[in-house]
Amino acid sequence: MVFGISDTPSVEPEQLENLIQDGFKLIDVREQDEWNAGHHQSAEHIPMDTITESMDRFKDSEKYIFVCRSGARSGRVTNFIVSQDIESYNLSGGMKELQNFSEKIFNSEGNSGQII
C-alpha cells in the first residue's frame, strides 16, 4: 500500500500530550545529532534508516506517532508502518512546530533542547 504525502494519517502538535497520555508511542526518526540537540522527553529514538530492521519493536496492538524535524521523513515512515497494518500517524509540522506547543523538549544531557 502506497500513500501520497497528502494521504498520510496525521495529528496536530497541540494534540500530542493528550495522545501520549492515551497510550500513543512517540517515535523520533531523526538522525543522532538532531536527537542529541533536542527531543521530546517521551520519545523513543529509532532513526529512519533503521526502521525496517527495527520492525520487531512495533506491535499491531500499539498506536504510534512519528516525528522528524519538519514532518517529511516521518511522513514516509508513517506511510510505511501503516502499510504493515500498524496504526500510525505523522506529527504535522514535526519538531519545528511541536516546539511551539511543548515545554518537554530536552537535549541528551537533560537541559532545554533546541531543534536543528
State what each model feature region is.
Residues M1-K25, Q32-K63, A72-I116:
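Rhodanese-like catalytic fold shared by cysteine-dependent sulfurtransferases
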